[in-house]
Amino acid sequence: MKLNTNSNAYIIIYSAILVVIVAFLLAFVFQALKPMQDANVALDTKKQILYSLNIRGLDGAEAEAKYKEVVKTKAEDDGHILYGCVVNGEHITVATLKGMGLWGGISGYLAIKEDGTVYGAYFNHESETAGLGAEIKDSQAWQEKFIGKKIFDENDNVILSVVKKVEDPESQVDCVTGATLTSNGVDAMIKESLKGVRIYQVDCRFPTKSAEEE
C-alpha cells in the first residue's frame, strides 16, 4: 500500500517525530554545554569579586589564580554572602549585593575595609538603559567614587548612600547622571544587602569553609 504523504495523518505523525528528534538534540546539546556554561558563570563571579577589590584586566587563567591567592574564605550568615580576602596584607570583606534597578535586577560586590570604609565596588545589571542606568556597570570612574566612603555609623547602621545631591561627602556618592531611578535602586540595594553585615563581617581568620568549596 502506497503511503499518502499528503494526508493529514502523515503530516501530523511526521511533525511529531521531528519535534521529538529536535527536542532530544536540544536537550543533548544543553547537557553537553552545561559544564562549560557553569564554569563561565563561576569565572565571571570570581572576576566581579576581583573587580570590587580593584583587581582588573586579567584573563581567565590569571583571574582564577588571583582569586585563589586573595579570596580566603566564604561565609553565609543570616542571608548574607561574604568573602574574606587578603590584599597586600590587608584584610578585606567582600559583601554580595542584590536588588532591583529600573528595568530589572541589579547586583554587585562591595569590598569593606576593617575600619568600615569602602575598599572598592563593582555593580552589574540585567537590563538597564545603555548610556544611562547601564553606567553603574560600564563606568569604572563612577564605581571608584565609592572608595573611601564610610559605610556604617557608630551603631553599625548603613549610612553609605547614593544621592542626587551630595551633602555628606564622607558617606554619600553622586547618582549616575540621567539615571536617578537606577541610582535609587543601587542605594536601596546597598542599604538592604548590607543590613547587619557589620555584625557578620569576616576576614581570612573567619571559621568557615574555603571560598573554593562552592
Where are the regions that the model predicts?
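Flexible, solvent-exposed loop/hinge segments and secondary-structure transition points
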Residues: 2-214
